[in-house]
Every structure is written in structure tokens, then in C-alpha cells.
């Protein structure tokens, strides 16, 4: 392979060195992605990698120029996120220098090209981004010969989502066509920048529409069980580890062929059949009729966002009703109705958690711990080793994987669940009149005693200056100024949430040096644990890095 190395900037004027970055409040989607990546056992999990095939009589320089045009048009491709006084902000740079590699594979046969491309995708996926530098993307331009090109594009989830990939591919295709034909590119108009969208989003959260959404979700989620009852292989630890693993399978050919017809029969979309089968499986193994399932949604209902590159994904909670032993037809109807109702009342997930004042249990994610994701196109991406939920079923085209919390489940359990799911899905498609109680699943998982924690101990007041300092900030953030803080109480059980934890750490950070990391604070979210860290080194700086 002829590898030409990093690309150089094209012939445009150099960026104005005097121009500084522009700052804006982070969007809700950026907050979620940033927090998740900081807590992850494996940060590269939060890197998306797409490969875009292109066919045009162009040069490598034309494609490098096209990537710079994309970066100039879309603010997230020039953005890095920073915390300022405990709040997350976008820092948009005028023209940062991305890493763009060039490789000539034109002399290779198809098999050798495929292997080189696979290796490159894997390398870009596993290379973490510097969280302090823009841009949060990189690319490789591959010459495949005879007018065939491929651009491998890797980006952090804080600046890029699935829909962004379609937009990047469309714009690259048009820019190549324009270069080939010697004309100006006809690119879609961008009605607003991402920073302006962030401001609009915050403003809408304060309007009457937000009140209607709040009222809907208060009613819909009232009395929701705080944690699922799917049996665990081990008691839940008091702090989340975010350590995950996965098992994969391919959809049987017969299932794939039957999906479209079955969805048409039910008057719904294929995704609803996948989702209904997932809730049926969880019902079988938990015995619960009332289940919460987290659903990632595109978050691009605003027409002004359709052509933008950035991250817009929100999490929505499906409350699945499996009472009364419904058959498959009724279950699909209930699932479709519940999902459609939620689509009318979108609200940022962080706001929903705060709004509902969700009871927090040690080591338990709020509102839902079981999740489902569906992408119509093939491509599950590289294996993951982090997990935000207890269980996530991820369906992409003709493949699926079950991502599981490795602190809670064994691989053998994940294998069993995935095999059960495929059997259950096939019956749901072939015999929708089958009731839940008659579905051909394996034996239900055995219940393992759940950790109940030690018996409540007497409250312990702050015992030294370090604990007093932490407790003072703790009280202010949680609105408990008049009460005594128990130094062993869990921050999240006491009503705190992730963004408040970020502000807590910011206020306690030393004037110089690094402060505690979110991931380590999550491992011991108490006054005592944080105070120990703050006094762990002679100069007062924390040893947590």
C-alpha cells in the first residue's frame, strides 16, 4: 500500500490566528454524550466510524478540500467541550487542523483493499480523541482506483450522530460532483448554527410546550418501578462500574424476509416488532407486567436541524404494559400506541429525571436500566467494553447484539437471552395470535439475591475541615442548607444528578492542578470519599486523574 501520510491544508487562506474560539452552552445531547464518555470504562466506545463510498473523477486534494468545506459549514466539526464553573460549554474554533490521512490502494486487489479498509476503520475507532482539543473528528481518504474513492470518517459522539453520517455523505457526494463538473456545489441551506440551536433548545425548555410535556410524563410515569426485576447473576454493586461486554447474532433469513409483511399486517413499522419482542422477553424473565425501556431517538423533529451535522439524540422512556397475558397482535398494538404517544411530548432526558424527582438507588441508573436501539442500516460497529444500562438490545439491519453490564451478568446469560429473543421474535412474526404465556422461550433466569446494603447506620456528621468543606457545597447544590449531611450518604440517593456532580467537583477543584474525575466520584459518591481525595496529597491537589 502506498500511504501518503497526513494531508496538508488545501490552497485556502490560512485561518486568522488572532480569531479566538466562540463559546456557547452545550446542548442537552452533548451533555449526555460527554458525561457518558467520561464515565465509560472504554472511552473509544464513544467514537462513531463511518465509511463513505464515492465515485467521481476527482483528486485526493479535492476530497481534502471537501472535508474542510464540511468543517467550515458545520460548527460541531470545529468544536471541543469544556467545563466552566461546573457547566459544560461548547468552544467553537475558527479553523482547527484535523488529521486527514491519505492512502493509495489502487494497486491492490479487492480482497486486499477490503482488509486494509477494515484495519483502518478499526484503528480509527480505537484511537481516542484528545478531549481538550478541536476538532473531535479525523478522516482517511482512500484511492481505490478507476474513479472509486472511500472516505473513512471517525468522530466523537459529542459532535456527531447517526443522522450526521447521512448528511456528511450527501455533502461529500455533491462536493465531488461539483469538482468533477467544474461548478459550484449545491449544498443545503443551514438555517441556523449549532450554537444558535443550543440557545433555541434552552429557550424552548422554558416555554409552555415544555409544561405540556412535563404534565404528560408525570402522568405516564407515575408509579413506575424504580428498578427492573430481571434476575442478575451477581448482586448489584453500590456504585456503577460502566464495564460492559456484548454477544452478537445474525437475524435468520426467514425473519428478515417476514418483517415487512408482518409490520404491514399490524399497521406499524418493523422496529415496533423488534421492540415488542424485546419487552416480551424481559417480561418472561422478570415476571413483571410493568417495564421501563429506554429508547434513543434522533431528536431532529425541528426541520431546521435536518441538514445539520452534530449530536441531537435524546433518550425517551417507554412504559411497556404486558398485563393480562396479551397475544402478539395486542402487544404490538400497545407498543406502537405507547411509542407514538411519547413522540408528541419530547423533553430532554436530564430534565425529565429532575422533573420527576426520581428516587435514586445506589448503583441504579434513573428511570430505566433496560434499553433498545434500532438502526435500519447494517453495521453494529466495533465490539464495546462499556455499558450505560444493565441490558441493551441493539438491532442494525440484519444483525443484532446484546450489550450487558459485566458486573451484573455473565456471558452465558447474555447468550441465553439472545437465543431466547430470536425464538420469540420468530413466533411473533409467524403466529401473532400466540399469548405471552405460550411463547417458546427457555426457562426463566433464576433469581439471585439482590444487594440490600448494610443495615442503616446512625448518621455521621462531618468530622474534619475537609468533610465540612465538601458538605457545605453539597448542601448548597442539593438545597439542604439547614440539614446535617451524613458523610456516608450517596450523592445520587440524596437527590443529586450527574450535572450537579459536575458542579460539585468544579467548586471543590483546586486553584491549580486537576480536580476529581466524574468516574472516580461515581465510584464513591459520598462526602467522606470526596474529602479523602481532596486531602490525599500534601499540596491539596487530588490524586484522581
Listing of model-derived features with the role each one plays in the protein:
Residues 63, 495-496, 508, 530:
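Short, compositionally simple motifs enriched in small residues
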Residues 1-41, 65-109, 120, 133-135, ...:
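Short amphipathic alpha-helices and their capping loops
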Residues 57, 471-494, 501, 511-519:
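Phosphopantetheine carrier-protein modules
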Residues 76-81, 290-293, 518-519:
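Short, hydrophobic-rich beta-strand element in sensory/regulatory alpha-beta domains
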Residues 19-20, 433, 437-489, 545:
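Acidic/polar alpha-helix N-cap and adjacent early helical turns
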Residues 80-81, 172, 176-192, 220-230, ...:
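A short N-terminal helical cap/helix-turn-helix that marks the beginning
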Residues 3-4, 427-447, 484, 500, ...:
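AMP-binding/adenylate-forming catalytic domain of the ANL superfamily
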Residues 31-40, 49-57, 67-69, 83, ...:
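Adenylate-forming
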Amino acid at each position: 500500500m502506498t500511504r501518503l501520510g497526513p494531508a496538508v491544508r488545501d490552497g485556502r487562506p490560512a485561518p486568522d490566528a488572532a480569531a479566538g474560539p466562540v463559546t456557547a452552552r452545550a446542548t442537552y445531547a452533548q451533555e449526555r454524550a460527554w458525561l457518558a464518555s467520561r464515565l465509560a470504562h472504554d472511552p473509544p466506545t464513544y467514537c462513531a466510524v463511518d465509511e463513505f463510498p464515492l465515485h467521481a473523477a476527482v483528486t485526493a486534494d479535492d476530497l481534502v478540500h471537501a472535508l474542510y468545506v464540511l468543517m467550515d459549514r458545520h460548527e460541531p466539526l470545529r468544536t471541543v467541550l469544556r467545563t466552566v464553573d461546573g457547566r459544560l460549554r461548547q468552544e467553537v474554533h475558527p479553523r482547527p487542523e484535523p488529521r486527514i490521512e491519505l492512502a493509495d490502494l489502487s494497486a491492490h486487489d479487492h480482497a486486499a483493499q477490503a482488509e486494509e479498509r477494515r484495519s483502518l476503520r478499526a484503528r480509527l475507532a480505537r484511537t481516542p480523541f484528545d478531549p481538550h482539543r478541536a476538532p473531535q473528528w479525523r478522516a482517511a481518504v482512500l484511492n481505490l482506483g478507476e474513479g472509486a474513492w472511500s472516505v473513512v470518517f471517525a468522530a466523537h459522539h459529542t459532535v456527531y450522530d447517526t443522522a450526521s453520517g447521512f448528511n456528511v455523505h450527501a455533502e461529500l457526494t455533491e462536493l465531488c460532483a461539483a469538482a468533477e463538473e467544474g461548478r459550484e456545489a449545491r449544498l443545503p441551506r443551514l438555517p441556523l448554527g449549532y450554537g444558535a440551536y443550543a440557545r433555541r433548545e434552552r429557550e424552548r425548555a422554558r416555554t409552555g410546550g415544555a409544561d405540556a410535556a412535563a404534565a404528560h410524563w408525570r402522568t405516564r410515569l407515575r408509579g413506575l418501578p424504580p428498578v427492573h426485576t430481571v434476575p442478575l447473576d451477581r448482586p448489584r454493586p453500590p456504585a456503577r462500574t460502566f464495564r460492559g461486554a456484548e454477544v452478537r447474532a445474525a437475524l435468520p433469513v426467514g425473519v428478515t424476509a417476514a418483517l415487512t409483511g408482518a409490520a404491514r399486517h399490524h399497521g406499524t413499522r418493523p422496529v415496533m416488532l423488534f421492540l415488542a419482542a424485546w419487552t416480551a422477553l424481559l417480561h418472561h424473565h422478570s415476571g413483571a407486567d410493568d417495564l421501563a425501556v429506554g429508547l434513543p431517538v434522533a431528536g431532529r423533529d425541528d426541520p431546521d436541524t435536518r441538514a445539520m451535522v452534530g449530536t441531537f439524540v435524546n433518550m425517551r422512556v417507554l412504559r411497556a404494559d404486558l398485563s393480562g397475558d396479551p397475544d402478539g397482535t395486542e402487544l404490538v398494538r400497545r407498543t406502537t400506541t405507547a411509542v407514538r404517544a411519547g413522540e408528541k411530548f419530547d423533553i430532554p432526558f436530564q430534565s425529565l429525571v429532575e422533573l420527576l424527582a426520581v428516587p435514586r438507588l445506589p448503583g441504579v441508573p434513573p428511570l430505566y436500566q433496560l434499553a433498545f436501539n434500532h438502526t435500519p442500516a447494517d453495521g453494529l460497529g466495533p465490539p464495546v467494553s462499556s455499558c450505560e444500562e444493565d441490558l441493551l438490545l441493539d438491532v442494525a439491519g440484519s444483525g443484532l447484539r446484546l450489550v450487558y453490564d459485566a458486573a451484573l451478568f455473565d456471558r452465558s446469560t447474555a447468550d441465553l437471552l439472545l437465543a431466547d429473543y430470536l425464538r420469540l421474535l420468530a413466533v411473533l412474526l409467524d403466529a401473532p395470535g400466540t399469548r405471552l404465556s405460550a411463547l417458546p422461550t427457555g426457562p426463566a433466569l433464576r433469581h439471585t439475591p439482590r444487594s440490600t446494603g448494610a443495615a442503616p447506620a446512625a448518621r455521621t456528621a462531618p468530622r474534619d475541615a475537609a468533610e465540612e468543606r465538601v458538605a457545605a457545597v453539597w448542601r448548597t447544590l442539593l438545597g439542604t442548607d439547614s440539614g446535617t449531611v451524613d458523610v456516608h450518604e450517596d450523592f445520587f440517593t440524596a437527590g443529586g444528578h450527574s450535572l450537579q456532580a459536575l458542579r460539585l467537583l468544579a467548586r471543590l477543584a483546586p486553584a491549580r492542578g486537576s480536580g476529581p474525575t466524574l468516574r472516580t466520584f461515581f465510584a464513591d459518591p459520598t462526602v467522606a470519599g470526596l474529602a479523602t481525595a481532596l486531602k490525599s496529597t500534601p499540596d491539596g491537589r487530588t490524586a484522581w486523574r
